[in-house]
Curated annotation (Swiss-Prot):
PANTHER family: LARGE RIBOSOMAL SUBUNIT PROTEIN BL27M, RIBOSOMAL PROTEIN L27. The keyword Ribosomal protein applies. The keyword Cell cycle does not apply. InterPro entries: Ribosomal_bL27, Ribosomal_bL27_CS. It comes from Paraburkholderia xenovorans (strain LB400). This is Large ribosomal subunit protein bL27. One of its GO terms (biological process) is translation.
Length: 87
């Protein structure tokens, strides 16, 4: 009789789903109020003018305008600002 031995089992073979972190709107691009600018773990970038921070450290626009990235201080902190659109 033809037989096939049982295949082994493995406890590996899993991976977590990617979290899609990173910059969503780049410098100079237009953004509406409430739009997400950066998704991040921890404060790699800090909120500046017209930018709010969610409880998961997501940076979002508080007003309509254009996104601007800059550094601040001796520690060269990365700041994210929204320059309001001219009315």
């Amino acid at each position: 009789m033809a037989h096939k031995k049982a295949g082994g089992s493995s406890r590996n073979g899993r991976d977590s789903e990617s979290k899609r972190l990173g910059v969503k709107v780049y410098g100079g691009q237009a953004i509406n109020a409430g739009g997400i600018i950066v998704r991040q773990r921890g404060t790699r970038m800090h909120p500046g003018e017209n930018v709010g921070m969610g409880k998961d450290h997501t940076l979002f626009a508080l007003t309509d305008g254009h996104v601007n990235f800059s550094t601040k201080g001796a520690a060269k902190k990365h700041m994210v600002n929204v320059v309001p659109a001219a009315v």
